[in-house]
């Protein structure tokens, strides 16, 4: 039997909302395969939906900077260990220097930035006593760029055609709040669609419906699924009776691309207390 770590159980709990023992059993059944465990739990009704992977967040800041010509934008995530340091003036100044250099020299590789700023990073670590990591950098280039920064923890860059700055700002705010993964439903990769289709079909078939009826049920569910994860298919947060796609059409605008960063997405913190909890339960089962 595969070893099921506390970390795996914790991830499955966070992504499904199911109980610890249900998650542990599901992982045992799948030999530690989290994605397969999620699919199986959804089919059995133990998990209504799976949250996008993103374990307990690390600390740090998101920074945005747009060129003077307003045609190139950069977005950076710089991590530290505590919220206290994230608010430190020296830490913020370091982040600002990194993003300004990245934008000026068009550096889109975090590894190149790490090499370039290693001496300053080491000195700052020695000064404040916490590890600091240049986690990621990205850029967006377009004739029309919009941006939004929410409390230095969520940042968005968005490019579009036919949109003024007010329209772009509203779009960026929506993206920050609603977390779309793709621009249009047609952009959702076939493997993502196929996987969800199979899960929904298995759920529908369990109700005892004939396959043709089940397929019709799934068709509606899939339209909802792709709509919810694509920008243009989501209900617009500022006018919930309209989709973003409808709102864009009214304004004669088309979104080309967007980038959304949130501090600590997918970064795992220490799970000591949770591990102790799992270990205690494991001992009871022996």
Curated annotation (Swiss-Prot):
InterPro entries recorded: EF-Ts_dimer_sf, Transl_elong_EFTs/EF1B, Transl_elong_EFTs/EF1B_dimer, Transl_elong_Ts_CS, UBA-like_sf
Protein's recorded name: Elongation factor Ts
Native organism: Hamiltonella defensa subsp. Acyrthosiphon pisum (strain 5AT)
Molecular function via GO: translation elongation factor activity
Alphabetical keyword list: Cytoplasm, Elongation factor, Protein biosynthesis
Region Involved in Mg(2+) ion dislocation from EF-Tu, annotated ranges: 82-85
Annotated localization: Cytoplasm
Stated role: Associates with the EF-Tu.GDP complex and induces the exchange of GDP to GTP. It remains bound to the aminoacyl-tRNA.EF-Tu.GTP complex up to the GTP hydrolysis stage on the ribosome.
Domain of life: Bacteria
Main localization of the protein described in the UniProt heading: cytoplasm
Family of this protein: Belongs to the EF-Ts family.
GO cellular component terms listed in the entry, alphabetical order: cytoplasm
């Amino acid at each position: 039997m595969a070893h099921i770590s506390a970390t795996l159980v914790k991830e499955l709990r966070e992504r499904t909302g199911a109980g610890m023992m249900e998650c542990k059993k599901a992982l045992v059944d799948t030999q530690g395969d989290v994605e397969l465990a999620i699919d199986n739990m959804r089919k059995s009704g133990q998990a209504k939906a799976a949250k996008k992977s993103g374990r307990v967040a690390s600390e740090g800041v998101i920074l945005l900077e747009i060129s003077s010509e307003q045609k190139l934008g950069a977005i950076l995530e710089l991590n530290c260990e505590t919220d206290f340091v994230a608010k430190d003036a020296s830490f913020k100044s370091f982040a600002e220097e990194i993003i300004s250099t990245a934008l000026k020299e068009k550096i889109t590789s975090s590894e190149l930035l790490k090499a370039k700023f290693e001496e300053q990073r080491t000195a700052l670590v020695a000064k404040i006593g916490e590890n600091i990591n240049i986690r990621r950098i990205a850029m967006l280039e377009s004739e029309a760029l919009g941006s939004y920064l929410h409390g230095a923890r969520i940042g968005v860059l968005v490019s579009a055609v036919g949109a003024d700055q007010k329209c772009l700002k509203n779009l960026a705010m929506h993206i920050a709040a609603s977390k779309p993964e793709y621009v249009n439903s047609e952009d959702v990769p076939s493997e993502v669609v196929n996987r969800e289709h199979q899960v929904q079909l298995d759920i529908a078939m369990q109700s005892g419906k004939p396959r043709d009826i089940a397929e019709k049920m799934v068709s509606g569910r899939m339209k909802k699924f792709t709509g919810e994860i694509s920008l243009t298919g989501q209900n617009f947060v500022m006018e919930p009776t309209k989709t973003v796609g409808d709102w864009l059409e009214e304004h004669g605008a088309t979104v080309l691309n967007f980038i959304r960063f949130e501090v600590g997405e997918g970064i795992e913190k220490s799970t000591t207390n949770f591990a102790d909890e799992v270990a205690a339960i494991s001992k009871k089962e022996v």
